[in-house]
């Protein structure tokens, strides 16, 4: 057993402390085996060995391996007679005597106390130097990188100028070592260093280079190579693996980076070069080598280095050396005493002697039995020859011995016997055929005792596989293997075992197929900042090789997907090595073989009834439920599994994993067959390259996190649910299905986004032709477009003045406020004089004061916090919105709660105006909105859009029945005030109860529970289950009610303006707080059937299908809710449980699902299109049976139907139509809101004039703070007909603009 390297445990806190240069005394231990060979020593020599005690420290005797075997020889007696004290003394010579152990333990206690003290002092120092530490905290990544590079250059400059003798004896005890240990020039001339680098590059070895260039030792040689590499930025591309061997590892690199990033380190600080070497446990040459590696990596120069992971390192670093040595000594002494008590004859010797005696006696007995058997055989042969004489007339003798009847019977019996033999042979042949057919595949995947294999001790799909040797086959599902790295023997299931004797190169797989095949793949991952590690992970082959340019598409069990290249045919790289056949492989040869093969075949495979690979059963072999469900769905659709189109520049949300539903925004920067390469957003928006989309990115200063994602993965937000909505029966219209389908279908050409509100363009918008509807824009030069963009922003900002009020200090304080406190300045916020200012500015025109206070936080230099305090007309200070609410209540003010905002970003005084020459219409709403809606055009001379303005929605024609829009279809609340307490308002409780019926994950935004009602007339988050406002049935006060928002008039001033490229838009004329109501979207109410008939004029359609909205949101938030992922059920074959009830538990009325095994029919929702077809064929009320394959039927027979309640939307509304809003000919301000990839407005469904779930109002709320002059936009989520061959480009101008309006 080789001597182990000393383990050095360095306390970071003690090294980085500011006082003291001492380091911990480092202890070492030597593992050795006491091996006294009696044949080589006589009794006297053995006694001398025991008497010698401890050898002199530092001699070669400490590292010698003393070998010996305790046998049954009589000479052992002398050894056994030795007292145990001498034995302990001898053992202590290897592990250190008791006094040394006590000293080490004492020193450790002292060090622990010192460490605690140092940490306390360091904490005090950090508090005293708070500004210094804050500077390091607030630095950007770019600034931190610059500081790190400066430190690296300083340390390299010092280390490379060390005197040659200092490289060998580097214990700097001189306090002036920083100046006295170095020279003015590098230790080796730079030109000479370059020559050394070239020689090293050619030989790839350090051997002989020190003598060739007359260097004192190898450490100076390493330093010279680093100097040469740094001077040329490693143009030679030196392989650092040879240099780092036995010098540094990834642990050293990590320690080095930690030291450099520490704020109080540097060449001239207390934590200088000496502390650096102590902290990283390195010599000067190794320090130069580490700093060189980090500098090359920081600057993006070539740096070839792969650290091999060594699990022994961590084990050695964690050893308690004293405890380890004491345990060995105690065990050895105990064994010594036990042997003496048992007598002189050693137990092992006795057992060996007994064993050999048994062998000898058994051999003699066996020999005698064999001789007796041979003799008996010879006697029997001789007896047969004597008793049975030979004669030729056999048939004649038979004929003479039997009568005619007996002969006939014998002949018949022989005929029957021959017939039976023939039938038996035929049956055996048929049975053999069946056996061969069913077991060829199984025989292919069988391990043999003694074979190498890949196995995992931890039965988890995420765990990696390591090399092992087969010990025994326990049963058909279990093998006993011995792991090579740990020598453990364990029983492993065949789903955790992979073969090394077979691979993808085997011709037999051409017969079995590879789709659904369970495999283990070799993957190289990053194990540290500078190292890589090779592991084997299990997965499923998911695509035919020819469909992916000769690569295998692998779905790994841990949730990732990748292409894996593996040789399958002669001539391909690695084929000869991978396919080599030998009776015996060494471990090294086997590793080389598997590295070439890249893919190993798992022992456990999905075998069907016919004995072949059945990929429909693959999901049974995957333990993780989410991954198993995904594989199940994929194999059912194979090869028709759809891929989401992900063009470069597209932005999409990506889930962390199938289990972790947290989302991150990513940008598509490239594609690779069925994969898209996406770039994650940097946590710091100011980081270098945050908006870079180059792939590959060659800017060394950019820090990117790129990932390859399978375009059919359920980690892509909405992809699984959209595909599910298309492929299953639901209540989506064919028009909506076509829109969803287009996201998975190819498109041919791209066209510009039309001017959505331009009268001439409307007719051409969705015809599906190749005509370029924006040809006029295309014809314009870039200069003209730039001019249009500039003219678009020709507006003025004015400041709305406030009246002069009595100074606050002159107002008298009083205990109780009342109506008189309003100073007769109170007014209705809807008065005409407030139309040209922000509603939040209105209180300031009524005697209120809104004062911003800026205060220092005291945590960081320059960090401030801005607070808003309102002062009422009587001088009362109101610090929060609840104070304002109470004041309005007690004073009975006409001002409403939404006229107040504590958002410090809001500038209440700014108002946007335009020159009179650009004003086309003073009030486009013709007075219907209660506030003027001007229309302006500073871009061109186009006439105002042709639209009949309407504030309320209306029925399209007499065929549309909207009789449910009535107070008779509403329930009201019993509140007698302003409904400010949601817990007491029955209408707000309806909203809360509707939210509670949603799946649990849709009730939260991250870790925050969503609030399903207004808060002070603000909507903090979108409520997909819908909001219930108070209505005509309620007894609350209409104007002051906190739950009446959408039904009120527009409050914030806006105007319609002509944009440069997107037609007419809507601009905010004042600052608008987040969560504020903007306006509604109104138009003609159409039935869904009418909408399908008008599908070519659907550019102004808005679906009122609340259930559809909920289902799509479920798909975006957590698609496994729809598929049954993540539940407690283990029966993944439950087709009805997976598809039949998705999204139907939203509403209150519940029905029970029928048991398909009893009724013989499956309860399936009909699409509106199929319902219409059924009615035409006379089957309007019937329920269609779903087409199932024999496999589906077989699997369903084994599944118990679960009796769970769901709300059946279609049964509830089946006699009644669903509705769509069309604002093409007649509408309101909401019709002019344009699309944006980064919208500041979102849509909310609200019910107040009816509680008919089919007829909610469509309302717009701000999703973030809007500045005066900003355009109000929302995300259309617009998709085109699947038969269309064009795409619309987007000109929203957002930083994250995908460039596409139609998402194909």
From Swiss-Prot:
E.C. number: 2.1.1.-, 2.1.1.367
Catalytic activity: N(6)-methyl-L-lysyl(9)-[histone H3] + S-adenosyl-L-methionine = N(6),N(6)-dimethyl-L-lysyl(9)-[histone H3] + S-adenosyl-L-homocysteine + H(+); L-lysyl(9)-[histone H3] + S-adenosyl-L-methionine = N(6)-methyl-L-lysyl(9)-[histone H3] + S-adenosyl-L-homocysteine + H(+)
Residue ranges of the region described as Disordered: 1-31, 1113-1201
Gene3D superfamilies on file: Methyl-cpg-binding Protein 2, Chain A (3.30.890.10), SET domain (2.170.270.10)
Residues that bind Zn(2+) 2: 973, 987, 1030, 1034
UniProt entry tagged with the keyword Isomerase: no
Positions with a binding annotation for Zn(2+) 3: 979, 1030, 1036, 1041
Compositionally biased region (Basic and acidic residues): 1113-1122, 1152-1165, 1182-1201
Coiled-coil ranges (or none): 97-129
Every Post-SET domain range: 1286-1302
Assigned keywords, A-Z: Chromosome, Coiled coil, Cytoplasm, Differentiation, Meiosis, Metal-binding, Methyltransferase, Nucleus, Repeat, S-adenosyl-L-methionine, Sexual differentiation, Transcription, Transcription regulation, Transferase, Zinc
Domain Pre-SET: 971-1049
Domain of life: Eukaryota
CC terms in the record's Gene Ontology section: chromosome; cytoplasm; nucleus
Binding site for Zn(2+) 4: 1237, 1290, 1292, 1297
Similarity comment: family membership: Belongs to the class V-like SAM-binding methyltransferase superfamily.
Name recorded for this polypeptide: Histone-lysine N-methyltransferase met-2
Species name: Caenorhabditis elegans
């Amino acid at each position: 057993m080789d001597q182990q390297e000393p383990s050095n445990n360095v306390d970071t806190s003690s090294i980085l402390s500011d006082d003291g240069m001492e380091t911990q005394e480092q202890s070492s231990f030597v593992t050795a085996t006491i091996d006294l060979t009696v044949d080589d020593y006589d009794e006297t020599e053995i006694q001398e060995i025991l008497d010698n005690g401890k050898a002199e420290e530092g001699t070669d005797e400490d590292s010698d391996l003393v070998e010996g075997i305790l046998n049954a020889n009589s000479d052992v007696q002398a050894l056994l007679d030795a007292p145990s004290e001498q034995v302990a003394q001898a053992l202590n010579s290897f592990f250190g005597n008791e006094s040394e152990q006590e000293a080490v333990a004492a020193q450790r206690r002292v060090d622990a106390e010192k460490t605690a003290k140092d940490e306390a002092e360091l904490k005090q120092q950090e508090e005293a130097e708070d500004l210094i530490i804050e500077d390091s905290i607030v630095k950007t990544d770019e600034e931190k990188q610059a500081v790190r590079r400066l430190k690296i250059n300083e340390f390299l400059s010092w280390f490379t100028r060390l005197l040659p003798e200092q490289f060998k004896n580097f214990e700097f005890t001189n306090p002036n070592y920083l100046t006295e240990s170095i020279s003015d020039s590098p230790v080796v001339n730079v030109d000479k260093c370059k020559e050394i680098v070239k020689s090293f590059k050619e030989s790839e070895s350090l051997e002989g280079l020190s003598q060739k260039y007359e260097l004192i030792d190898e450490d100076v040689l390493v330093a010279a190579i680093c100097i040469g590499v740094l001077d040329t930025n490693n143009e030679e591309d030196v392989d650092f693996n040879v240099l780092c061997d036995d010098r540094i590892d990834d642990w050293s690199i990590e320690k080095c980076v930690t030291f450099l990033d520490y704020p109080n380190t540097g060449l001239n600080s207390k934590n200088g070069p000496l502390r650096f070497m102590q902290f990283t446990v390195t010599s000067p040459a190794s320090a130069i080598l580490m700093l060189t590696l980090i500098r090359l990596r920081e600057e993006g120069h070539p740096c070839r280095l792969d650290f091999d992971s060594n699990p022994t390192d961590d084990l050695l670093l964690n050893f308690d050396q004293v405890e380890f040595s004491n345990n060995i000594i105690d065990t050895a002494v105990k064994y010594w005493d036990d042997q003496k008590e048992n007598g002189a004859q050693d137990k092992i010797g006795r057992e060996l002697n007994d064993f050999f005696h048994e062998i000898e006696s058994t051999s003699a007995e066996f020999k005698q039995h064999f001789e007796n058997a041979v003799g008996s055989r010879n006697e029997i042969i001789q007896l047969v020859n004597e008793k049975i004489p030979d004669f030729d007339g056999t048939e004649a003798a038979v004929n003479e011995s039997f009568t005619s009847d007996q002969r006939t019977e014998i002949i018949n019996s022989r005929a029957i016997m021959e017939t039976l033999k023939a039938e038996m042979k035929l049956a055996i042949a048929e049975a053999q055929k069946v056996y061969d057919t069913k077991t060829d595949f199984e025989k292919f995947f069988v391990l043999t005792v003694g074979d190498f294999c890949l196995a995992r001790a931890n039965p988890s799909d995420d765990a990696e596989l390591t090399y092992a040797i087969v010990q025994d086959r326990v049963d058909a599902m279990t093998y006993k293997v011995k792991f090579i790295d740990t020598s453990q023997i364990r029983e492993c299931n065949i789903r955790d075992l992979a073969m090394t004797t077979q691979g993808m190169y085997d011709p037999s797989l051409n017969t079995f197929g590879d789709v659904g095949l369970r495999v283990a793949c070799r993957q190289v991952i990053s194990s540290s900042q500078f190292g890589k590690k090779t592991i084997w992970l299990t997965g499923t082959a998911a695509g035919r090789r020819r469909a992916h340019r000769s690569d295998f598409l692998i779905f790994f069990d841990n949730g990732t997907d990748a292409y894996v290249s593996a040789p399958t045919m002669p001539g391909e790289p690695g084929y000869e090595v991978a396919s080599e056949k030998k009776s015996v492989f060494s471990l090294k040869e086997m590793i080389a073989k598997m590295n070439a093969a890249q893919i190993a075949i798992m022992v456990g495979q999905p075998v069907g009834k016919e004995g072949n690979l059945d990929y429909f059963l693959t999901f049974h072999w995957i333990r993780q439920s989410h991954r198993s469900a995904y594989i199940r769905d994929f194999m059912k659709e194979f090869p028709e599994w759809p891929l989401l189109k992900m063009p470069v520049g597209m932005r999409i949300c990506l889930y962390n994993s199938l289990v972790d539903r947290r989302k991150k925004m990513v940008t598509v920067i490239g594609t690779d067959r069925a994969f898209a390469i996406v770039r994650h957003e940097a946590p710091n928006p100011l980081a270098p390259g945050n908006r870079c989309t180059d792939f590959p990115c060659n800017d060394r200063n950019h820090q990117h996190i790129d990932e390859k994602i399978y375009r059919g993965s359920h980690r892509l937000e909405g992809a699984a649910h959209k595909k599910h909505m298309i492929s299953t029966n639901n209540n989506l219209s064919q028009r909506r299905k076509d829109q969803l389908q287009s996201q998975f279908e190819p498109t041919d050409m791209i066209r510009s986004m039309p001017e959505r509100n331009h009268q001439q363009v409307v007719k051409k918008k969705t015809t599906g032709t190749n005509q370029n509807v924006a040809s006029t824009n295309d014809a314009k030069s870039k200069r003209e477009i730039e001019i249009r963009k500039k003219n678009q922003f020709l507006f003025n900002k004015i400041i709305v003045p406030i009246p002069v009020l009595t100074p606050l200090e002159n107002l008298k304080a009083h205990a109780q406020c009342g109506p008189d406190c309003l100073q007769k300045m109170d007014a209705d916020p809807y008065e005409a004089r407030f139309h040209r200012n922000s509603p939040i500015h209105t209180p300031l025109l009524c005697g209120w004061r809104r004062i911003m206070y800026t205060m220092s936080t005291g945590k960081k230099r320059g960090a401030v916090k801005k607070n808003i305090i309102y002062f009422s007309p009587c001088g009362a200070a109101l610090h929060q919105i609840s104070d304002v609410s109470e004041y309005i209540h007690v004073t009975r003010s006409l001002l409403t709660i939404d006229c107040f905002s504590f958002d410090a970003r809001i500038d209440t005084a700014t108002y946007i105006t335009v020159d009179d020459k650009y004003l086309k219409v003073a009030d486009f709403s013709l007075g219907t909105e209660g506030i003027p809606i001007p229309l302006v055009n500073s871009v061109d001379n186009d006439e105002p859009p042709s639209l009949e303005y309407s504030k309320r929605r209306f029925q399209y024609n007499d065929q549309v029945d909207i009789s449910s829009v009535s107070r008779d279809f509403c329930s009201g609340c019993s509140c007698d005030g302003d409904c400010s307490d949601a817990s007491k308002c029955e209408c707000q409780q309806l909203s809360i109860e509707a939210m509670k019926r949603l799946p649990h994950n849709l009730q939260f935004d991250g870790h925050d529970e969503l609030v399903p009602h207004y808060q002070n007339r603000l909507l903090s988050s979108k409520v997909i289950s819908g909001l219930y406002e108070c209505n005509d049935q309620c007894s609350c006060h209409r104007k002051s009610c906190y739950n009446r928002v959408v039904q009120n008039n527009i409050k914030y001033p806006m105007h319609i303006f002509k944009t440069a490229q997107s037609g007419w838009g809507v601009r905010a004329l004042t600052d608008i707080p987040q969560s504020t109501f903007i306006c509604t979207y109104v138009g003609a109410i159409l039935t869904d059937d009418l909408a399908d008939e008008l599908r070519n004029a659907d550019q102004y359609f808005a679906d009122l299908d609340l259930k559809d909205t909920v289902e799509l949101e479920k798909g975006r938030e957590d698609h496994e809710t729809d598929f049954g992922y993540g539940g407690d059920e283990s029966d993944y074959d439950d087709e009805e449980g997976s598809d039949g009830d998705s999204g139907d538990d939203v509403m209150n009325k519940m029905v029970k699902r029928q048991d398909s095994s009893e009724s013989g029919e499956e309860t399936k929702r009909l699409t509106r299109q199929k319902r219409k077809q059924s009615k035409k064929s006379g089957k309007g009320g019937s329920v269609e049976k779903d087409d199932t394959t024999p496999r589906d039927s077989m699997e369903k027979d084994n599944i118990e139907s679960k009796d769970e309640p769901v709300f059946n939307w279609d049964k509830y509304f089946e006699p009644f139509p669903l509705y769509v809003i069309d604002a093409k000919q007649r509408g309101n301000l909401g019709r002019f809101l344009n699309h944006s990839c980064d919208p500041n407005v979102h849509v909310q469904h609200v019910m107040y004039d009816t509680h008919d779930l089919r007829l909610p109002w469509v309302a717009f709320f701000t999703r973030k703070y809007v500045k005066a002059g900003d355009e109000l936009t929302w995300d259309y989520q617009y998709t085109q007909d699947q038969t269309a061959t064009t795409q619309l480009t987007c000109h929203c101008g957002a930083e994250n603009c995908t460039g596409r309006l139609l998402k194909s």
